[in-house]
Amino acid sequence: MRLHRTNNSRRCTILLILALKIFDFVDTLACYSCIALNYRQNVLSRNDALSPPQNRENLTALFDVLSKNNISHVEVSSSCADVTLTTQPSFLNTPIAICDMNDKCVKMDFYYSGEKVVLRNCLSNLMETVNSPKLKKYCPMYSDDRSEIKVGPMSNVSVCSCQSDLCNSSEKSSVMIYFSIAFILVL
């Protein structure tokens, strides 16, 4: 009987420790943390190989420009790129950053050497100082509302922010939810 109480006591202690860890984790914000050239739009299938493969070596000039403009480095991931409106975004295996709950997730896109670049991260990890006068409050998949911000050789810089877990994705799914709700209401 005494052995049974010891096991129960040990289980309770372990469960309490796990619960405290979970509550501590709830006070954080999860954001996608990646960068990619956006030529994913020209690929037929989401799972098709990208050519040439994206990596730090063939994007050295881009990373140098980001460093010079106090924008932190993030992991290169082809799944970070925006996709066409007819393709469901897939962020499978995309790196995630855990940030303070008071932080924001951001999606930044811009043109560099004629290529569209998409960068996602926590705001505090991305920029040392927030010098963008225009942070949009949601992250749409496509937007004609472009900030006319120029940062070094980066042009048409657009930055959006949001404050819920993994909200800095391509928001096609939320658009589809709105269309579904509208369709149901019409019926």
UniProtKB/Swiss-Prot annotation:
Keyword Signal: yes
Subcellular location: Secreted
Primary site of residence: secreted
Signal peptide: 1-28
UniProt entry keywords in alphabetical sequence: Glycoprotein, Secreted, Signal
Residues the record marks as carrying a glycan: 58, 70, 156, 168
Pfam families, sorted: QVR
Coiled coil: none
Keyword Transmembrane helix appears in the UniProt entry: no
GO biological process: regulation of synaptic transmission, cholinergic; sleep
GO cellular component terms listed in the entry, alphabetical order: extracellular region
Protein name, entry field: Uncharacterized protein F46C5.4
